[in-house]
Amino acid sequence: MAANPSGQGFQNKNRVAILAELDKEKRKLLMQNQSSTNHPGASIALSRPALNKDFRDHAEQQHIAAQQKAALQHAHAHSSGYFITQDSAFGNLILPVLPRLDPE
């Protein structure tokens, strides 16, 4: 039941190597950013992250739409109520529709 110290050491070395690689990449990106701000013709490189962000936003919206559809189908299959998809400040994918009954 003793922990395997060699396996733990390997994991730590792996983590250190990953962190070092990330730090090196970060420094490289910072250097590229500094050089592009010094040269006005290098603004093309700055527009690419915006394109990637738009692509990520679109992919995220498609993922949310798929989740909403799945939640809506599940709710309709397992409940006698009626539900709609609606953006919610509380993160709900679907909301129940409750009928208003006139007081008698």
Swiss-Prot record:
Q: Indicate where the modification N-acetylalanine is found in the sequence.
A: A2
Output the GO biological process annotations, alphabetical, semicolon-separated. DNA damage response; DNA repair; response to ionizing radiation
Task: Look up the domain of life of the source.
Answer: Eukaryota
Keyword Nucleus listed? The answer is yes
Pfam families for the chain: SOSSC
What is one cellular component GO term in this UniProt entry? SOSS complex
Q: Where in the cell is it found?
A: Nucleus
Coiled-coil stretches: none
Per UniProt, which keywords does this protein have?
Acetylation, DNA damage, DNA repair, Nucleus
Role description: Component of the SOSS complex, a multiprotein complex that functions downstream of the MRN complex to promote DNA repair and G2/M checkpoint. The SOSS complex associates with single-stranded DNA at DNA lesions and influences diverse endpoints in the cellular DNA damage response including cell-cycle checkpoint activation, recombinational repair and maintenance of genomic stability. Required for efficient homologous recombination-dependent repair of double-strand breaks (DSBs) and ATM-dependent signaling pathways.
Task: Quote the subunit structure annotation.
Answer: Component of the SOSS complex, composed of SOSS-B (SOSS-B1/NABP2 or SOSS-B2/NABP1), SOSS-A/INTS3 and SOSS-C/INIP. SOSS complexes containing SOSS-B1/NABP2 are more abundant than complexes containing SOSS-B2/NABP1. Interacts with INTS3; the interaction is direct.
The family note in this entry says: Belongs to the SOSS-C family.
Record-given protein name: SOSS complex subunit C
Q: Which organism is it from?
A: Bos taurus (Bovine)
The gene coding this protein: INIP
